[in-house]
């Protein structure tokens, strides 16, 4: 996905071509989410129309999160939807991360600034 920063896209492609899969995906995540941070920071209308939901928050508090999304969108029947979908939402327990501690550190290094900016958007 090219979000207007061709050099960034080329850097991601170079990382992947060099076998740096984790770095490439971390940079890709940072590019996409950085675009979102800038868009929401620059446009009050877009910011007001947007509800950012972290997957971890949805899994930790599904009823509250679904209710907040439906309220944000001014959709009816929130309690029916909450009751229907909440029981099925949970954090995955079917895999262990294959990432090494060095790879997790690399991801944090590549994404820290954007991840911190995203914290204020919840």
Regions found by a protein language model. Give the residues of each.
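PAPS-dependent sulfotransferases, especially Golgi type II membrane carbohydrate sulfotransferases
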Residues: 1-122
